[in-house]
Amino acid sequence: MMRYALGVEYDGSEFLGWQQLGEMGPSVQATLQQALASVADSSVRVVCAGRTDAGVHGQCQVVHFDSAVTRPPRAWILGTTTRLPSSVAVRWCVPTSEDFHARFSACARRYRYRLLNRQVRPALQHQFLSWERHPLDAQAMHVAAQMLLGENDFSAFRSAQCQALHARRELQAISVRRDAEVIEICVQANAFLHHMVRNIVGSLLMVGTGERPMEWIAELLAGRDRTMAGPTASARGLVFVGPLYPEKWHLPMEVSV
């Protein structure tokens, strides 16, 4: 058996999320597995670096799969992509060792959240942009966000459905910046809780509108109470930029936050 690593890009708008959930609806995982199985002429199961929710996009999701069939990387890339809908594409393929694991070999994961901050909702690229009509203070949001850095208990920002055994995560980097009418929030951590990024964004938006002071974010973190934090931000503005791996795996992780 040969193990392969793939870099996958997808528009999550029409999917119920990454994970295959029986017959409930289309998932990125099931769609990719079906295309790979056609190339391999046998069933294929993929394991991803990080599962995304319904409506969340993937810029460079990394997966691994095992196959008894030997194909050159180009054949896996082109053969699979031609069998995928236009909303999913394989960016690269690297043969790797059986020690590599898309999830457990990753040392960090990165997300990007983008929203349009103007009076009128977006018509172009609306599936990739959230929207906030009230003026936002991006600098205040950025300063408040720095209070989340480090290893902390992020219970205030996890969903009620989160199945993680504990809420401690290491937030390694977070930034909020404005480019004209678009505000971009970039986050990197060793791992994330369910809805963690969207819940952080929802709370930062309340700081941005002036509803809450910057210090409120630190109070939420210390309080560990989800009911005291802001609402969960829309999924449509969220992109899983991708995972980071140690250099020994030689994966083409050229995507930067």
Curated annotation (Swiss-Prot):
The protein's Enzyme Commission number: 5.4.99.12
SUPFAM superfamilies in the record: Pseudouridine synthase
GO function terms (MF aspect): RNA binding; tRNA pseudouridine(38-40) synthase activity
InterPro entries: PsdUridine_synth_cat_dom_sf, PsdUridine_synth_TruA, PsdUridine_synth_TruA_a/b_dom, PsdUridine_synth_TruA_C, TruA/RsuA/RluB/E/F_N
Chain sites annotated for binding substrate: Y111
GO biological process, one term: tRNA pseudouridine synthesis
Cited Gene3D superfamilies: Pseudouridine synthase I, catalytic domain, C-terminal subdomain (3.30.70.660), Pseudouridine synthase I, catalytic domain, N-terminal subdomain (3.30.70.580)
Disulfide feature: none
Catalytically driven reaction(s): uridine(38/39/40) in tRNA = pseudouridine(38/39/40) in tRNA
Record flagged with keyword Repeat: no
The keyword Isomerase is annotated on this UniProt entry: yes
Pfam families in the record: PseudoU_synth_1 (PF01416)
Domain of life according to the entry: Bacteria
Entry annotation: catalytic residues: D53
Keyword terms of this UniProt record: Isomerase, tRNA processing
CDD domains in the cross-refs: PseudoU_synth_EcTruA
Quaternary context: Homodimer.
Family: Belongs to the tRNA pseudouridine synthase TruA family.
Protein task: Formation of pseudouridine at positions 38, 39 and 40 in the anticodon stem and loop of transfer RNAs.
Protein name: tRNA pseudouridine synthase A
Organism classification: Bacteria, Pseudomonadati, Pseudomonadota, Gammaproteobacteria, Lysobacterales
Gene: truA
